[in-house]
Structures are given as C-alpha cells and as structure tokens.
C-alpha cells in the first residue's frame, strides 16, 4: 500500500499542478493562466476583437502550462540577435516554425494586403483634408515615445511601445519584431486589448474636448469619386511613400496592392482569397504564435505594467490630437467639419469611425458621421504605417 502512495506522490511531483503551486515562481504561471482566461472571456463573451484576442489568449494559455518546449524563445532572441537555425532544426516545434512568419516580418504585410481588399478609400479621396486628421491622431505615438524614454526605455524599445498609439496591431507587431522582439508579447497584448476598448476609451475624451454644439454639426455629403481616381490612388500613394520612406514601403505597398485588386475589379478571385482565406489563416498564425511569447518568466515584470500604462496614454493622446485638429478645422471652415471625426484618425478600422458615428448621434439622432469619419480612419492606417517606417529608419 505504501508503494502505491509513493508512486502517486512521484506522479504528482512531476505533474503540472506541482510545478505551478509548489515550486518557486510557480505563482507567476497561475497569474498568467488567469490573464489568459480573462482574454478568452473578453473575446468570447464580450466579443472584444475576438479574431485576435481568442488565438492570443489561447496561445498565452498554452505557453504558461508546464509543457515541455511548446515555444523556444532562445531560438529567436539570443546573444547574436539572429535566428539560431541550428537550434531551430534540432529542437524547434510547430509553434517555432509558425513564429518564423512573425520574426521575419511576413505576417503583418499579408494582414495589410487583406485589409486593403476590404478598405474603401473613397471618403479620403473625396476629402483629402482627412489626411491631416489621420496624421494628427498619430501624435500619441510620438508623445508616448518621449514618455517611454523618460521611464528609461531604449530608443528601440520606446519606438516599439509608442507605435501602440497607432491603434494598429499588425504595425505594432511589425515594428516590435524589428526593434525590440523581447517586448513583443507585452506590446501585442496591450495593442489589441486597447483596440478592443476603443469604444470605452475614446468617448470621454471626445466629450471633454468638444461642445454640444460642435457635436451636433451636420456635415455635407462628400463628392462622388470616379473609378479612375480609386484606381490611381493606391498606385500614387505607393510611389510617394516608397520613394520618401522606403522602410514603410512593404506595409503601405501591401495595403495599396490589396486595395488596387479590389478597385480594379479584374482579379475578383484572388481578391476574395486575400480578404478571406489568406487573411483568416494569417490571423490564426499571428495571434497564436504571439500569444505563445507571453511566458510568465518574461511577461510578468514592471516593464509590462509600464507598457500597459504607456499604451493607454498613447491611445488617449492620439484621440485628443485628432479631436483638437478637428476643432481647428471646424473653426477654419466656419463650422463645416464636425470635430468628432478627428478621433477616428487612430487606425482602429472601423471601430473608431463607429465611435464617432455613435457620439454624433447621441448629440443629434439625425446626424450620420460614419462615412465622414472613415476618411480620417483609413488615413490613420496609412499614418501608422508611415510612423512605423520613420521609427525603423531611425532606429532599425
């Protein structure tokens, strides 16, 4: 009988339960499992960015279970700062190979390709001044960069943290894998959580910075945009951005290629593939592999707390920057621009534009701002990619 109990004790000692609850530092893994469950709750029950939070949350769950070698961070982050191909070949598993798409910067541009097939740039083409609102909303990126520097982060780390303010998860991942891959888990989780919380974060700032009269402004319908303009737009933008800022060319180029495929109407089959099947597959790979980087040993530290705080500051300042420029444009145009559309300059598409619409209708139920807000919203996508290119050019 004693031998049976001894065997049971040995089995328990080798189990994951013992590693979590009876080893030094095991509590960290329990905390991370709780965080993973919170992300899954937000994705499934609250439906906050479920397409990303669900795979990220499950990846976080898997990597913080006491399993042997689901993900080997030392393959990608080591003294040489290069992928250890020999170690990958000898010890790499499925997640390691999937993560190559993140490390090599493959997934974010492909996500942009898919986004391009679903994006309508007509509101931006019809009202080019929307570009200014999209640019103003990137203020949060550079403000947070300065804040991160003050807190002691390096230039590369500060740039990666700052890009959270663009409200663009793929761009944040793209920049972080280039500049500060050791912060990828924290930055990705912060970026996507705050993207999901745009309807919660933005309204108080929008109300605080605008008057009731400004929120009630009804904007005139934008002009009609010809098909020729829609086709020329992605081509011209790609040329200008690529020649001006080569480091942003891959993101902006893929975005514009996807849009050109859509607007040309001559490659309907691959347009649907890029916007549906390819986009869905890449989303699964990206979310799950990024979630697997959030191991308790590297995630639970003071840096993560600072990143989360800086991230919400970035969102707040970006929203405020867009609204304040919207107020200036309202003044200059003698009340023809509703300042609420400025908050849509962050590139959370289309959530930020929907928030502008909702706040406008609260002030005036007959006010429809969605199409007007989509201009700054899609301009913000371009703006965040350009900001990413600036950081990579400076610190890459």
Report residues per predicted region:
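Alpha-helical membrane segments and immediately flanking helix-loop junctions
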Residues: 104, 112-118, 133-143, 147, ...
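Membrane-embedded hairpin module used as a gating/binding unit in multi-pass transport
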Residues: 193-266
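Hydrophobic transmembrane alpha-helices of secondary-active transporters
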Residues: 39, 99-125, 258-261, 279-301
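Transmembrane helical segments that form the transport core of multi-pass membrane transport proteins
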Residues: 238-322
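Alpha-helical transmembrane segments
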Residues: 182-200, 310-318, 341-344
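N-terminal alpha-helical transmembrane segments of multi-pass membrane transport
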Residues: 1-77, 90
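Entry/N-cap segments of selected transmembrane alpha helices
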Residues: 123-145, 295-322, 373-377
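Structural signature of hydrophobic alpha-helical transmembrane segments
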Residues: 20-32, 83, 96-111, 155-165, ...
């Amino acid at each position: 009988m004693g031998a049976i109990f001894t065997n049971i004790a040995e089995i328990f000692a080798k189990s994951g339960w013992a590693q979590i609850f009876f080893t030094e530092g095991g509590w960290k893994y329990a905390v991370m499992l709780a965080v993973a469950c919170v992300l899954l709750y937000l994705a499934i029950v609250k439906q906050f960015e479920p397409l990303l939070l669900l795979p990220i949350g499950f990846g976080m769950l898997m990597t913080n279970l006491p399993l042997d070698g689901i993900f080997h961070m030392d393959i990608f982050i080591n003294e040489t700062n290069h992928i250890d191909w020999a170690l990958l070949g000898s010890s790499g598993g499925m997640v390691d190979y999937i993560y190559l798409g993140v490390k090599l910067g493959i997934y974010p541009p492909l996500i942009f390709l898919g986004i391009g097939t679903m994006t309508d740039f007509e509101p931006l083409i019809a009202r080019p001044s929307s570009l200014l609102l999209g640019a103003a909303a990137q203020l949060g990126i550079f403000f947070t960069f300065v804040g991160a520097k003050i807190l002691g982060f390096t230039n590369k780390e500060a740039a990666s943290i700052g890009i959270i303010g663009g409200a663009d998860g793929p761009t944040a991942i793209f920049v972080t894998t280039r500049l500060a891959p050791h912060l990828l888990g924290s930055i990705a989780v912060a970026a996507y959580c705050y993207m999901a919380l745009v309807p919660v974060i933005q309204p108080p700032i929008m109300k605080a910075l605008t008057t009731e009269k400004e929120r009630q402004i009804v904007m005139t319908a934008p002009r009609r945009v010809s098909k020729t303009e829609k086709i020329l737009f992605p081509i011209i933008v790609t040329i200008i951005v690529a020649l001006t800022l080569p480091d942003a060319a891959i993101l902006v180029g893929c975005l514009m290629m996807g849009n050109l495929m859509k607007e040309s109407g001559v490659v309907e089959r691959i347009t649907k593939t890029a916007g549906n099947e390819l986009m869905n597959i890449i989303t699964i790979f990206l979310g799950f592999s990024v979630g697997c980087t959030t191991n308790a040993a590297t995630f639970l530290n003071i840096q993560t707390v600072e990143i989360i705080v800086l991230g919400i500051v970035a969102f707040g300042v970006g929203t405020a920057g867009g609204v304040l420029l919207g107020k200036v444009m309202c003044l200059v145009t003698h009340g023809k621009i509703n300042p609420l559309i400025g908050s849509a300059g962050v590139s959370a598409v289309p959530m930020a534009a929907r928030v502008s619409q909702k706040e406008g209708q609260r002030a005036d139920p007959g006010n429809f701002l969605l199409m007007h807000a989509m201009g700054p919203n899609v301009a913000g996508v371009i703006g965040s990619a350009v900001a990413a290119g600036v950081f990579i050019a400076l610190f890459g």
